[in-house]
């Protein structure tokens, strides 16, 4: 698996129930434009605001609808046994990968994190993508990632959502250098080209919900060695990522941008998250007009 993977938003109705027709429409759109992978129950999908039953429902619905891209299911939780249960479910429905962020809320030692992932890997067979997002959960150090990948062949890659070129560099040199089949993805739009240049495999990036054409054009230009064009798209993505600075949360930023671009997904976040108002929406609109 390489390329542009989209961590999709979860569409909600005004009453906060899941908007299934909007989900179907969005998955159809992303596959038609040619993204390489679709990731459901992601951070962008507000998985922490979903019940276990809703997460299972979305995973099953996504598996039914995603037919022309790699299919990834998020199974993270602070409860190791629940992660195993959700990961087994992702495996049983035929997902290509399970994406698992570390436990959050309670700080854990590296040994505790190793045990968490070890238990999951030993109880499941599905390929696992580690997800390092230290702003929201316990951090995965490079030595810990290397130890896990050496011990467990099913740990197939990592998504790194942190503003550090050095971390990506070290994962590629120290981990991918030992296991050539290990996949390395950035979670930040502005680091997409950096990651490819360093030898990574792509990105799992939220702005691809509303502007996948930029990510896809960059990836194509890079692979075809049209580097000036790739640099231009990278500059656009760097500017586009400023959308996160405009809004009060990444969820609000993405759903406002989708509204501005004409998607039918409603600008609704589940509590406790809140949407920004008209003033922020107009700033998002101005940014998108400048970049796109």
From Swiss-Prot:
The keyword Calcium does not apply. GO terms for molecular function: 2-dehydro-3-deoxy-phosphogluconate aldolase activity; 4-hydroxy-tetrahydrodipicolinate synthase activity. One of its GO terms (cellular component) is cytoplasm. Keywords: Cytoplasm, Lyase, Schiff base. The active site is at 43 (charge relay system), 105 (charge relay system), 131 (proton donor), 159 (schiff-base intermediate with substrate). One of its GO terms (biological process) is small molecule metabolic process. Its EC number is 4.-.-.-. SUPFAM superfamilies: Aldolase. Pfam families: DHDPS. It comes from the Archaea. It is found in: Cytoplasm. Homotetramer. Belongs to the DapA family. This is Uncharacterized DapA-like lyase TK1237. It comes from Thermococcus kodakarensis (strain ATCC BAA-918 / JCM 12380 / KOD1) (Pyrococcus kodakaraensis (strain KOD1)).
């Amino acid at each position: 698996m390489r390329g542009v993977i989209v961590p999709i938003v979860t569409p909600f109705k005004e009453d906060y129930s899941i908007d299934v027709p909007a989900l179907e429409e969005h998955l159809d759109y992303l596959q038609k434009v040619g993204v390489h992978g679709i990731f459901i129950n992601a951070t962008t999908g507000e998985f922490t605001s979903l019940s276990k039953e809703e997460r299972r429902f979305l995973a099953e619905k996504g598996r039914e609808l995603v037919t022309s891209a790699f299919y990834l299911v998020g199974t993270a939780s602070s409860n190791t046994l629940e992660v195993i249960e959700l990961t087994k479910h992702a495996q049983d429905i035929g997902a290509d990968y399970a994406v698992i962020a570390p436990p959050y809320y309670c700080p854990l030692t590296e040994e505790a994190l190793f045990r968490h992932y070890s238990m999951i890997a030993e109880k499941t067979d599905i390929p696992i993508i580690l997800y390092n997002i230290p702003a929201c959960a316990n951090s995965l150090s490079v030595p810990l990632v290397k130890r896990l990948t050496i011990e467990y062949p099913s740990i197939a890659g990592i998504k790194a959502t942190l503003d550090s070129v050095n971390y990506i560099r070290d994962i590629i040199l120290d981990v991918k250098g030992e296991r050539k089949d290990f996949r390395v993805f950035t979670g930040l739009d502005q680091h997409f080209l950096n990651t490819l240049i360093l030898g990574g495999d792509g990105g799992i990036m939220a702005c691809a919900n509303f502007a996948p054409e930029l990510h896809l054009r960059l990836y194509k230009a890079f692979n075809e060695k049209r580097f000036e064009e790739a640099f231009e798209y990278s500059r656009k993505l760097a500017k586009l990522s400023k959308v996160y600075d405009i809004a009060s949360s990444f969820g609000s930023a993405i759903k406002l941008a989708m509204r501005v671009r004409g998607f039918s997904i409603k600008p609704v976040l589940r509590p406790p998250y809140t949407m920004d108002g008209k003033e922020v929406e107009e700033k998002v609109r101005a940014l998108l007009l400048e970049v796109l």
